[in-house]
Amino acid sequence: LIHHRFAHKVLGRSDWRAVFEVHQMLGSIHFRGPLGVSVRSSLPEGYSEEWHEVEKSPDGRVTIEWVIRTPKRTMKGKIVRGMIPDDPLVSKTVEYPIKGVEDWLAFLDFRLRWLENAKEPVFDEVAEAVKVMGEDGIASVGLTPAFTALAERRGMEQFLLDLYDYPDLISELLEVERQVMEKHVEAFVSSPAEVAWLDICWATGADMGPKNFEKWALPDVVRAMEKVREAKGKYLGLYTLGRIRRLLPMLVETGVHFIETFEPNQGDISLAEAKRLYGDRVCIMGNYNCLVLAFGTVEDAREEA
């Protein structure tokens, strides 16, 4: 994986073309980058989700206002970007738009209206990437699961508390958000891309234990995989972070085609052990220390591999 931030460092650009070009410079294969699909939805008047740049400091720091609107409620958050001069694409949400039950209810209404008005899939960028990359890369599509979609609007800590404080409401929200997710999975299936990855890192990184993961997050994977399994020549994998050892049995059982990243810094299982346990059922990817690749010698990199 070459991150779009690395492409920006090398080329001054961060789009999928820049990532692909850096792969070509290194002689590696593009597998995952900033590519996605969407679904057109003509929301009724008064409903919108928007991001606006509201302030730019001389030092390069940019403040972005995040606004979710319904006719009865407006929810605002704030994102800061550019606070690290040497890595200007790093951003941090410093205020989340969803702040409590009333906001959740308004967002539920927003999502229901989105579903009612969902129309055709949009994948023009993916189609172009597939054509440009040819046999030199895999134009894989990133998909957002329901757990992530809700948590990134509420913030991890508060969202985990909401699972306990308002379980019925969160269950209802997750069900609606899974229907939104399924629309995007269908868009991937309709696109010329062969591979998609479901970004479940918010759920695995939450370290909430197998029982809670199975209850709140696993259905995202199951529902997405059901859609992909129906399509010929399509593959779905999982992007994970954190300690996933205890989650792997249920993740493998869903039938996903690959699992990454088995990170060495915060993970709790090596690629070798995962391959020994599950390598005959799923493709295992990752587990390479990126600091060695970035700052080590050629010999260090060989030893790490």
Please describe what each predicted stretch is.
Residues L1-D87, S91, D124-E128, G134-G137, ...:
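N-terminal basic, low-complexity leaders that serve as flexible interaction/assembly modules and, when applicable
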Residues L1-S14, E102-A305:
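Active-site loop segments of alpha/beta catalytic cores
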Residues P34, P44, P58, P71, ...:
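Proline-rich intrinsically disordered, low-complexity coils
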Residues R81-M83, T93-Y96, G255-V256:
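Short, charged/polar low-complexity linear motifs in solvent-exposed/disordered segments
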Residues D86-F110:
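A short, surface-exposed interaction/processing loop segment used at functional sites
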